């Protein structure tokens, strides 16, 4: 059975939504640029040998609609290349990598592009398609319950299923973070310290050249070249973030200092069978060892990485002690903290260059972005095995184990 190996990665800088460096770019234009950058790193590959372009997008509507994956293929002049657009919210472009892994293992193709994009700046009225009243009335009572809790103080999460009630499948991510923090005993101090850690580590990684190794500079319509992420801030202190006000509840724990912002960006990963890589004379960057995906209550979705990671580790025949570096997407400190604690991950292995609290989280981009970052980190720190994992809106988790090969 062939192995699935990663031969190239590329990503854009990450912009702040609505006010950042990439706000004037279309998602299809940026995605095409980044996929072409990833392909340029493997000139031995004939584009006609690519079996499929699978594009992850958290909210595929508006400019991100119309099967964006296929739009991008045609835009790049590859009419021969099939394209699809996949959403699993925050893990959309980890899902596309999983699909490439499965296709290669099944013998149904040798070369795949797994890419991801999210351009929140291009959303209208807060969502990608701007259509009103699309929620199913089946969840109306659950949504009303969430709204009521959001106005209360001192509320600890209780599983509605225990009362025969339906959970809120549309719950805002910030409310899930508040639920999880209280349910798992995570304090505001814990969260603020983690947020500062992310920013400080990202600042240090910028200084030592880590981030520039993986960023593809992007040229804006006015000719400006963007080569750095908008998010990382120098000199962030605990005292500074402790003064920030809660965002989601009157007595809330989540602030702008301990969660990710809204962002724009795109990333791409070129995945092929090990037999095809040998045929082309390529030395792969990494091998995809295993993946996992989990489901749990939408109201505490942030704990999704735990079961998903346990699945991936079991399938890899590894324990968490065998993993050298871990990347947990930092949607909220409120969910990273209980996830790494439950998994038994030492802090010195976790998000060692900072994470999404600092660099950002464009939903559809993040899966592919973290894959590239993890490979970069395994190379930079000379390590072998890495675990990528994230929580997913709607109450899911996803994970992937990779082994560095070069």
Model-derived features: where do they sit?
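Conserved catalytic cysteine-centered active-site region
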Residues: 25, 57-112, 152, 168-171, ...
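Active-site pocket-lining segment
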Residues: 55, 175-178, 216, 221, ...
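Conserved active-site "lid/cap" helical segment
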Residues: 1-58, 62-72, 76, 176-188, ...
């Amino acid at each position: 059975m062939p192995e699935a190996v990663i031969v190239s990665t590329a990503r854009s800088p990450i912009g702040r939504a609505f006010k950042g460096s990439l706000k004037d770019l279309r998602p299809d234009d940026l995605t095409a640029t980044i996929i072409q950058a990833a392909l340029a790193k493997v000139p031995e590959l004939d584009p006609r040998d690519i079996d499929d372009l699978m594009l992850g997008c958290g909210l595929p509507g508006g400019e991100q609609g119309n099967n964006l994956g296929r739009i991008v293929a045609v835009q790049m002049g590859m009419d021969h290349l099939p394209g699809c657009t996949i959403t699993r919210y925050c893990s959309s472009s980890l899902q596309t990598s999983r699909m490439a892994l499965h296709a290669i293992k099944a013998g149904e193709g040798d070369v795949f592009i797994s890419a991801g994009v999210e351009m929140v700046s291009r959303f209208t009225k807060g969502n990608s398609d701007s259509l009103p009243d699309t929620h199913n009335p089946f969840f109306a009572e659950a949504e009303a319950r969430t709204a009521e809790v959001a106005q209360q103080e001192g509320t600890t999460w209780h599983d509605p299923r225990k009362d025969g009630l339906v959970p809120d499948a549309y719950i805002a991510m910030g409310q899930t973070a508040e639920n999880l923090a209280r349910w798992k005993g995570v304090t505001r101090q814990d969260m603020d310290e983690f947020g500062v850690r992310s920013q400080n580590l990202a600042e240090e990684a910028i200084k030592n050249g880590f981030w520039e190794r993986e960023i593809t500079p992007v040229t804006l319509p006015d000719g400006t070249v963007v080569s750095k992420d908008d998010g990382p801030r120098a000199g962030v202190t605990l005292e500074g973030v402790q003064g920030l006000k809660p965002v989601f509840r009157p007595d809330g724990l989540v602030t702008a200092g301990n969660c990710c912002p809204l962002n724009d960006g795109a990333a791409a990963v070129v995945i092929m069978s090990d037999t095809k890589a040998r045929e082309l004379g390529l030395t792969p960057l990494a091998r995809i060892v295993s993946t996992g995906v989990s489901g749990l209550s939408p109201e505490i979705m942030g704990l999704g990485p735990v079961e998903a990671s346990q699945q991936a580790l079991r399938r890899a025949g590894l324990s968490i002690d065998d993993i050298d570096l871990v990347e947990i997407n930092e949607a909220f400190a409120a969910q990273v903290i209980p996830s790494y604690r439950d998994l038994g991950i030492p802090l010195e292995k976790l998000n060692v260059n900072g994470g999404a609290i600092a660099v950002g989280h464009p939903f559809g981009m993040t899966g592919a972005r973290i894959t590239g970052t993890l490979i970069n980190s395994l190379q930079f720190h000379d390590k072998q095995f890495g675990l990528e994992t994230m929580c997913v809106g709607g109450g899911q988790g996803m994970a992937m184990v990779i082994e560095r090969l070069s």
